[in-house]
C-alpha cells in the first residue's frame, strides 16, 4: 500500500480499537450490574466480550506497531501472531459453547438448571481458553514459515504458514464447529417453532419460555452470522494463496479482510445492546443514570448560580439602603440657617 493508504488503514484500525474497548466494556458492565452472570449463557457472552475487548486493547495496537515498521525477532513476531490466532480460536469455541447451551436449554428444559450450573459453565469457559491457547501456539513448536534471519520486519504471513492456517485452523477448527452450530440452531428454531404452534392461543409458562428462547437464539445466530461474514473472506483469500500460488491476491484485499476481522469485535456489542433484552435494559438504565446525573449536575449549577446572583442583588440592595440611610441622617443633622 502507498503511504496515504497505510495511514487510512491505521486510522480505521484505531477507530475500531476504540469502538471495541468502549462497546465491550459496556457489555461486561451491563451483564455484571443486571446480575445475569449467574446464568450460563451470559457467562459465555461475557467471555466472548473479553475476547473482543482484547482484540481492541491488545491485538489492534500490536497490528498498528507492526504496520508502522516495528522490527522484532522472528519468534517474537511469531508469538504476537499466535496471540491473534488464539483470540479467534477462543471466539469459535465460545460461540460453540453458547450454541450447545441454547440446545440443552430447549432439549432438556426440565433438567437444564441441574445439568448446566454456574460452576460448570465457568469450567467450560476456562477449557475454551486453555484449548484455544494450546492449539494456537502450535506454530511456536515448528509449524511456521522457515526462519529467515535473527530479526525481521514483523508481518503475519511472513511467519505463519499458510498450511497451518488452512488445514488446521480453517478446515479443522473453523468449518466443523460452524457446521455443528448451524445444526444446533436449526434444531433450536424447529423445536421452539413447533412448541409455539402447539400452544397457539394459549397463554402458558411453556409458551412464554419458548418465545423467550426463540428470540434469544435469533440474536445469538446474528452474532454467529456476523462472525462468519467477517472472518470467512480472509480465510478464503488464504486458501486461494495456498492452492493457487499463481493467482495474485491483492494485498489491499487482504488488509480489508483483516479490517473486517477486527470490525467483528466492535459490532458484537451493538448486537448485544439492541437484541438481548437484559443487556438492552441494563444499557438503558446506564443511559438514564448518566442523563439524570447530568441533569442534576446542571440543575445544581443553575441553583448555585441563582443563589449567587440573589446574594449579589441582596448585598447591592443592602448597600443602597445603607447609603440612603446615611444621606438622610446627614440631612437631618445639618443646622437650620
Question: Predicted segment positions?
Answer:
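Extracellular TM2-ECL1-early TM3 structural module of rhodopsin-like
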Residues: 2-14, 40-100, 105-115
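Seventh transmembrane helix
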Residues: 181, 229, 235-239, 255-302
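Helix-to-loop junction signature of class
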Residues: 13-16, 30, 54-70, 81, ...
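Alpha-helical transmembrane segments of multi-pass membrane proteins
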Residues: 17, 47-59, 124-136, 173-174, ...
Amino acid at each position: 500500500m502507498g503511504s496515504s493508504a497505510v495511514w487510512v488503514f491505521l486510522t480505521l484500525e484505531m477507530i475500531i480499537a476504540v469502538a471495541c474497548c468502549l462497546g465491550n466494556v459496556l457489555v461486561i458492565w451491563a451483564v455484571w450490574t443486571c446480575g445475569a452472570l449467574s446464568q450460563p449463557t451470559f457467562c459465555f457472552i461475557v467471555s466472548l466480550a473479553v475476547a473482543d475487548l482484547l482484540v481492541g486493547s491488545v491485538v489492534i495496537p500490536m497490528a498498528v506497531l507492526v504496520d508502522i515498521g516495528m522490527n522484532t525477532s522472528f519468534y517474537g513476531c511469531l508469538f504476537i501472531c499466535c496471540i491473534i490466532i488464539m483470540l479467534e480460536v477462543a471466539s469459535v469455541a465460545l460461540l460453540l459453547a453458547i450454541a450447545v447451551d441454547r440446545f440443552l436449554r430447549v432439549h432438556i428444559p426440565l433438567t437444564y438448571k441441574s445439568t448446566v450450573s454456574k460452576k460448570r459453565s465457568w469450567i467450560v469457559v476456562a477449557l475454551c481458553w486453555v484449548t484455544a491457547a494450546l492449539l494456537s501456539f502450535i506454530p511456536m513448536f515448528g509449524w511456521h514459515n522457515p526462519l529467515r534471519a535473527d530479526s525481521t520486519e514483523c508481518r503475519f504471513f511472513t511467519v505463519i504458514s499458510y498450511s497451518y492456517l488452512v488445514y488446521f485452523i480453517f478446515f479443522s477448527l473453523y468449518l466443523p464447529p460452524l457446521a455443528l452450530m448451524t445444526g444446533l440452531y436449526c434444531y433450536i428454531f424447529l423445536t421452539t417453532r413447533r412448541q409455539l404452534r402447539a400452544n397457539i392461543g394459549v397463554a402458558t409458562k411453556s409458551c412464554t419460555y419458548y418465545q423467550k428462547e426463540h428470540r434469544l437464539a435469533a440474536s445469538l445466530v446474528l452474532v454467529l452470522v456476523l462472525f462468519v461474514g467477517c472472518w470467512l473472506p480472509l480465510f478464503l483469500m488464504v486458501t486461494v494463496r495456498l492452492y493457487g500460488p499463481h493467482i495474485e491476491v491483492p494485498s489491499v484485499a487482504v488488509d480489508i479482510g483483516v479490517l473486517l476481522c477486527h470490525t467483528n469485535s466492535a459490532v458484537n456489542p451493538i448486537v448485544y445492546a439492541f437484541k438481548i433484552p437484559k443487556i438492552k435494559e441494563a444499557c438503558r438504565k446506564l443511559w438514564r443514570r448518566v442523563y439524570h446525573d447530568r441533569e442534576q449536575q446542571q440543575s445544581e449549577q443553575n441553583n448555585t448560580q441563582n443563589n449567587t446572583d440573589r446574594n449579589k442583588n441582596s448585598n447591592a440592595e443592602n448597600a443602597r439602603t445603607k447609603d440612603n440611610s446615611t444621606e438622610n441622617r446627614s440631612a437631618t443633622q445639618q443646622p437650620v440657617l
